[in-house]
Amino acid sequence: MSDLHFSYQVTNQKLQAIIKQVKTLAPDYILMPGDLIDTLDMVDKNSERQRLLNFLKKLGQQATVILSVGNHDMYRKPTEGQTGWQYEVASKLFDEIRALDNVFLLDNQVYEDENIYCLGYTQSPKYYRADKGIVEDMPVLLSELESLPEKYLTHLPEKKLKFALIHSPVYLNQPEVKYLLREFDYFISGHMHNGVMPPVLDELINSSRGLISPTKKWAPENSRNTLRTYADKLLVVGALTTFHECIKPFNKLNAFFPSYMALMEFTTKKTYSRKPYIKHIYKNW
């Protein structure tokens, strides 16, 4: 699950409903590829910060939680004389999250146990072209991936499932990117909010395109990819909060866009491929 965009509009009722749904699904791992918070402003108050940490703590009691970093997790609404991108401030929140039991926040880091290997790569503000709004930059993506420690990308454990959590999927199907990530089984992303595609159309239209992207591009690709072919590695997860606090008054439309989760089920039987069964869950909370 992805893109919670934690803010005042994400009520305790919604958080409890998410925890209840996770308990029903009973996963071994919860993978969250970024945008846990809407902006850093939303966790300035200690009460709100603790509300978020308590939610993650409860998730960690259900399954191993692995998070990566999204663009909203590093951003604060700009004030006079200050930039909106405040990575150092975000790092303090990341450390508080890492202090929770069974919760692992990966900021260009790796999680590994007896079953899985998981990279959490952070696309930096430079990738998002912070000085020009959200304009994603593929050369920066390639440069940042190449600058990661070689051991993060190559000679990976063959018998373990290998995941790369990368918030934005925009360029993840490009040949150059796929080559750098060739040893991974799956890329898990969010960011696109299912291309703001209503659930009924999401189920009926067999395409990776959505209606609109965060950069306001129409019919964007890689908006809602669901591993339709054996060669496909990219799973783009829809949002827990489609219209977030930052884009008032559109957040009133959340009533028509249920929260989304994707459950990946893997078989222990020998098969042609490790391609998992994907179950889509839509809930209005």
Where are these regions (language model features)?
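Acidic/histidine-rich helix-loop elements
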Residues: 1-15, 37-48, 75-87, 127-139, ...
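Binuclear metal-dependent hydrolase catalytic cores centered on His/Asp/Glu-rich metal-binding motifs
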Residues: 79-80, 87-91, 101-102, 114-166, ...
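Conserved beta-sheet core of the metallophosphoesterase superfamily
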Residues: 169-262
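Membrane-embedded segments
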Residues: 1-104
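Solvent-exposed loop/turn segments at secondary-structure junctions
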Residues: 6, 36-39, 71-75, 111, ...
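Short, well-ordered beta-strand micro-motif
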Residues: 112, 120, 226-228, 263-265
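Short, electropositive alpha-helical surface patch
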Residues: 57, 84-101, 120, 124-126, ...
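Active-site neighborhood of phospho(di)ester-bond hydrolases with catalytic His/Asp-centered motifs
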Residues: 1-2, 30-35, 64-71, 104-108, ...
